[in-house]
Amino acid sequence: MALSREELEVIERGLGRPPSEVELALFRSHWSEHCSYKSTRMWLRRLPSRAPWVVRGPGTDAPLVEIAEGLFVTFKIESHNHPSAVDPYNGAATGVGGIIRDILTVGARPVALLVNLHFGPLDHPHARWIASNVVRGISDYGNRVGVPVVGGETWFDEDFTYTPIVLATCVGVVEKGKVPPGGVETGDLIVVAGLGADKSGLGGSAFASKTLREESEEDLGAVQVADPLMGKKLIDLVQEAVGCVKFIKDLGGGGLATALAELAEWFGLGVEAELDKIHMSDREMGPAEVLSSETQERLVFVVSPQGLECLKSLLEKYEVPYSVVGRFVKSGRVRLLWRGEVVGDVPVWLAAKAPEMVWPRESYEPPPLPEIPEPPIDKAVELVLSSPNVAVKEAIYRRFDFDVGVRTAVKPGEGDAAVLKLYERGNLGIVVKGDANPRYAYLDPRLGAANAFVKAYRNVAVAGGVPKAAVDSINVGSPARPAVYWQFVEAVEGLKEAAEALGVPIVGGKVSLYNEYGDRPIKPTVAVVVLGVIDDVSTALRALWRDGDGVYLWGFTRGEVGGSEYMYRVHRLVAGRPPSVDYAAEKRIVEEVQRWRGRLTGAKDVGVGGLAAALAKMAVASGVGADVDVCKAPTDMGRLDYLLFSESNGRFVAAGEEGPGVKIGVAGGDRLVLRCGSTQLFSRSVDGLKELMSLGL
């Protein structure tokens, strides 16, 4: 992507001369929207990121959250939307590889991956091609590097037919003493390790900073190529290298241009790099290409001269190619050489920060919810339960090796969130879940973002975790569209409100702009991943009940069907406002589940598809039916369709001999029966539900 005229003027003023070709390459990469956040960082600074347990927040490759004395968890989210649109297999695989390397920068061992995937309808050939290859790319890479894919969220909507949203989150664990210490000083060396530089991924950050069009398949060269074997070597290398090195940085988006500029800025020093010294797979590359190359499976290590031999011995042990390409100096400049000649010399202050861009904003009102007739309930239940957005996602998660590493205590499909055992501290575990709802975010971006936050928070709580931290990913169209930029700003405000009200800091995130195809932007997609702590993973709750259990509903059901799956599937409408948020009620769910945790068989939150979907999912997961009187649910309305399909927040279903909230039924038999008093509304065998709710991919 070309620099704007205004940006070129800033560069020329800062340098006092026109930039060289190599300097232009540096600015094109590092000042791209993908790397610089020039249109968004002024808003992202508003997000709360501090708490006593947050050791390191946003601003570096990976945060650190202390979950037990001396034990840190790190987690980070990344988008790979544009690459996955044109080469879904490599786009998704390299997205997973990149987020794993972010986690490695703090010396952590990656223990889990989550994916938030948004595709077009599966009956569309192109959308199906993207979906199947994205899933294959994630599966192949995660399985081969030995990091389990333990959960996530999948959504289907026409907006994502040509512009998928592919988000990967990696979770890692590290002891306090194994985090690289920092303390970088002049004379320290810069070592690049991993695959040799080549032209794959060249211009990838610029590619991710423009809209997709029909000719975007010509951008295949901007998509990096994954190499999970080298990725696995880097994982193993880092576990031993932390004793040799001062700092680790992922060599990803923006290539060496971004890595050098960020390292110099972070440590308040200058850097001098000999670009011709880097090991290359393609010897035809010139200095500008080497600087901008986004070849995958590479890390930058900062090491003292005394520590170099220690690092080199490990690199040779793991057969990882490497180059000593530069050093830190006092100059406060990024100085680039090629075969002994200076080809770039830029002040760090100029290279580090692209000028901020604040775009015009224009709000809009969502379509109002019209008066609609109440449909036949049994047909409505069938339509909602057969929706791909409600369906059981076994067709996706069965392709992932979610048991590798033997930490996964609650597996995909078993509960509202993934639960992982941390062998470093007995039965201590972490609970993690990601959520997004593009319909909500389109209708009301602020409320939609808050809904994503509370849904992920509630999923963690209902599984038995105490939420501790969150990361987010905001995915929208071009910021040059006033309505789109308004969507982004409103989403930030919704996240800020939720994080402050719930007391959960946002320790990292990702913004992806220009998610459009032709002239059509996607529905804004605001994903939130919440991580919590559970003191004993053996008491984690799955979305199950046993024969004879009472079925209980905690929370109040309102007539909140705006943006719901019911309105879309049954009435073909995307209208109204998303459900309201009661933060106090969400926090009470944490307390309630903690109080009942040891006495319940299982629990499940009520979300997309409403109470009907929650009950059906528990029946399918358990292999046991239930007889439920939905009219016993606390509510202030009389419409049965709204009672069954409302997506009101602050609710969960629990099962056990006793339970929280109101008893609405009893589990047992091989059929799920929904009724109102003595009137049967819906009845289906558990096997029939499995067939109805299966996702065909």
From Swiss-Prot:
A single GO BP: 'de novo' IMP biosynthetic process
Residues holding ATP: 37, 76, 472, 509
Enzyme Commission number: 6.3.5.3
Subcellular location, record wording: Cytoplasm
The UniProt record lists the keyword Methyltransferase: no
InterPro entries reported in the protein's UniProt record: PRibForGlyAmidine_synth_PurL, PurL_linker, PurM-like_C_dom, PurM-like_C_sf, PurM-like_N, PurM-like_N_sf
Catalytic residue positions: 34, 80 (proton acceptor)
Subunit structure: Monomer. Part of the FGAM synthase complex composed of 1 PurL, 1 PurQ and 2 PurS subunits.
Entries under NCBIfam families matching the protein: FGAM_synth_II, PRK01213.1
Protein name in the entry: Phosphoribosylformylglycinamidine synthase subunit PurL
Organism: Pyrobaculum arsenaticum (strain DSM 13514 / JCM 11321 / PZ6)
Gene name tied to this protein: purL
